[in-house]
A protein has these predicted regions:
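Histidine-rich, glycine-flanked metal-binding segment
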Residues: 1-48
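Residue-level signal for inorganic ion chemistry
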Residues: 7, 26, 55, 79, ...
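Histidine/acidic residue-rich metal-binding segments in metalloenzymes
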Residues: 36, 109, 145-188
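Short amphipathic alpha-helices and their capping/turn segments at secondary-structure boundaries
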Residues: 36-38, 42-44, 102-117
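Amphipathic, non-transmembrane alpha-helical secondary structure
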Residues: 69-77, 81, 100, 104-107, ...
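Divalent metal-dependent hydrolysis catalytic cores, especially in the metallo-beta-lactamase
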Residues: 73-102, 119-131, 158-170, 184-188
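Glycine-rich phosphate-binding loop of ATP-grasp-fold ATP-dependent ligases
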Residues: 133-143
Length: 188
């Protein structure tokens, strides 16, 4: 069996131990001191679970706002090389058309379910429901008043994949949208 030899691993109720990990079909099949492990590569390192990135706009020269499956795949492959196994594709305040295109691309990728890298776990919708007084790097002309109906249209376009929304609760409609998001299990 191929795997990792002499690596440090945290095991629940035991602690950090030096052990071997056998891998079959891309999955952990064995953890223990069996010596019959053919090393994938020489290491004396630490094995940790894959990281989850809940706010990433892009990587590898691609951006979630490119609105294409190819861009999301580029991000996915880049993140996997860095130890990230799942991520939320993060949008930004842009035209409704650009946001919708980005969300539709996430829907396509998630429906297909085939990943060569990190899994697209959903969407972090950053804006457009932000404060016009505090836009930061977001373009003011695309800031929208917090609105549950508009959010629902975006969520439908994403295949109900929106998990987190960055918004301004202090603006008119903000608390109403927060309540709506809370009711459907979306973090605001």
């Amino acid at each position: 069996m191929k795997g990792l030899k002499n690596v440090k691993v945290y095991i629940k109720n035991v602690g950090i131990v030096k052990t071997n990990i056998g891998i079959e079909n891309g999955r952990i099949a064995y953890i223990g001191n069996e010596e019959n492990i053919e090393p994938i590569f020489e290491t004396d390192g630490i094995v940790v679970p894959g990281f989850i990135d809940e706010h990433i706009h892009g990587a590898g020269g691609a951006d979630a706002m490119d609105g294409t499956v190819e861009a999301l795949q580029t991000i996915s492959e880049f993140l996997a090389r860095e130890g990230t196994t799942g991520f939320l594709a993060t949008t930004m305040t842009q035209s409704p058309e650009n946001i919708t295109n980005a969300l539709k691309a996430v829907k396509k990728v998630r429906e297909k379910g085939e990943y060569k890298g990190a899994e697209v776990l959903g969407v972090h919708l950053e804006g457009p429901f932000i404060s016009p007084k505090h836009v930061g790097a977001q373009p003011l002309e695309y800031v929208a008043t917090p609105d549950a109906e508009l959010f629902d249209k975006y969520n439908e376009a994403s295949g109900n994949s929106i998990k987190i929304v960055t918004l301004a609760p202090e603006v008119e409609g903000g608390l109403g949208l927060v309540k709506h998001l809370s009711n459907i299990g979306v973090v605001a």
